[in-house]
Regions:
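Helix-breaking motifs and short loop linkers at transmembrane-helix boundaries and internal kinks
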Residues: 34, 66, 87-93, 231, ...
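Conserved MFS/SLC helix-loop-helix module at the cytosolic interface between two early adjacent transmembrane helices
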Residues: 53-92
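Helix-to-loop junctions at the C-terminal end of transmembrane segments
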Residues: 55-67, 251-263, 347-348
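C-terminal membrane-cytosol helix-exit motif in multi-pass small-molecule transporters
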Residues: 164-184, 370-375
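C-terminal transmembrane helical hairpin of 12-TM major facilitator-type secondary transporters
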Residues: 265-309
Length: 404
């Protein structure tokens, strides 16, 4: 494994921790600031929207510097945002800190995906992307449970200071292990934007929004759901998050392994099963053992979609993939924001803490429908397939997916 992939995974670990740890600390944050749980949920949706906005903007700005330098600048921004969150005296300032940190998220994973894919042979690209995202999934096994435990025992502010420390480690890893590379020449912004004329790119991003939104509809409010519905103690949430993280690690690795050879079948299975499991979660959430098993499955099925969705975007926009890759990361978080908002609506309407699971099931089923439409169009020749898209785009711009 190239050491540069390890550096990217380290950065992903820090980013993944700050993205997900807030879900285990919503009650503590809500209590300190005197806001409701749905209002505290804006810390999730605000972060997600920051990723959506920041992904294209930061990526475009990053075309002026080398990829390594841009990755380092993004980690610096991430550190600053988490320090602001940790020290924020008001809810508004904490939300601002979350947004500042989130601006680095999409561009880091977008640029990182292109770098990771270029480090290996073409038939191993999904595996390389999955290796980088392993840092994100491991954050849910180690970083998020540890951060939740620290937040519940010593205060949530300490958690965000620790996350800032993770950012420092990630910055050092990128500086040390990612090789210096010149700024890519010959690919202009119009070539990057042209990728969005490919309907398959847009369909893949739609799958990303809806599929990952299904996951977040359930897990955004996992703490009140498990404590008030399943009857778990507050301290048990840490271990439930470990199970969620283990599922994510397994799903990510499986998705990366099979996406290179069976991309669309992988999406069919993972999205279809995710919709079913989320619907069942409305029932299993009332039993501790069944809830724990279901949470693990949601993590696994949700993250099994990440490598194939990211690879599909890279394939369809292979001549100029940097912006499309980053925007697709934003699409993951647009799904997060949509799910957190819809989940808060159904909870606020009095349908209970299990109601977001129905929202998640509907979103995942909609993503499956888009996958069917995408594959059908591709087989009928109504839209360019991956190879044709690569040839067409490469005719106007040299490929960015190459060894660094």
């Amino acid at each position: 494994m190239p050491l540069a992939l390890l550096a990217l995974a380290i950065g992903a670990f820090g980013i993944g921790t700050t993205e997900f740890v807030i879900m285990g600390l919503l009650p503590e944050v809500a209590t300190e600031y005197g806001v409701t749980i749905p209002t505290a949920g804006h810390l999730v949706s605000g972060y997600a929207l920051g990723v959506v906005i920041g992904a294209p903007i930061m990526t475009i700005l990053g075309t002026r510097v080398s990829r390594k330098r841009m990755l380092m600048l993004l980690m610096g921004l991430f550190i600053a945002g988490n320090v602001l969150s940790a020290l924020a005296p008001t809810f508004g300032l904490m939300l601002t800190g979350r947004v500042v940190a989130s601006l680095a998220h999409g561009a880091f994973f977008g640029i990182g995906s292109v770098v990771a894919a270029g480090l290996v042979a073409p038939h191993k690209r999904a595996g390389a992307i999955a290796m980088m995202f392993t840092g994100l999934t491991l954050a849910n096994v180690v970083g998020v449970p540890l951060g939740t435990y620290v937040g519940q025992t010593t205060g949530w502010r300490a958690t965000f200071l620790l996350v800032a420390g993770l950012g420092v480690v990630g910055l050092a890893g990128v500086a040390k292990l990612v090789p210096e590379q010149p700024r890519t020449k010959g690919v202009r912004l119009r070539h990057e934007v042209a990728a969005f004329r490919n309907v398959q790119v847009l369909l893949a991003m739609g799958m990303t929004v809806l599929g990952f939104g299904g996951v977040f509809a359930a897990i955004t409010y996992i703490t009140p759901m498990m404590t008030k519905t399943a009857g778990f103690a507050d301290s048990s949430v840490t271990w439930l998050l470990v199970l969620l993280g283990l599922g994510m690690v397994g799903g990510n690795l499986i998705g990366g392994r099979y996406a290179d050879r069976h991309l669309m079948p992988m999406l069919y299975v993972s999205l279809g099963a995710l919709a079913v499991v989320l619907a069942l979660f409305t029932l299993t959430a009332h039993d501790k053992i069944a809830a724990a098993v279901t949470i693990t499955l949601i993590g696994g099925l949700g993250f099994a979609t990440v490598p194939p969705l990211q690879k599909r975007v890279l394939d369809q926009a292979s001549g100029a993939p940097t912006l499309a890759s980053a925007v697709n990361i934003g699409a993951f978080n647009l799904g997060n924001a949509l799910a957190a908002w819809l989940g808060g609506l159904v909870i606020g309407a009095g349908f209970g803490y299990t109601a977001p699971n129905w929202v998640g099931a509907a979103l995942a089923a909609s993503a499956l429908l888009l996958a069917v439409v995408s594959h059908t169009l591709e087989r009928r020749g109504g839209v360019r397939d991956s190879e044709a898209a690569a040839t067409d785009t490469a005719g106007t711009a040299p490929s960015l997916v190459r060894p660094v």
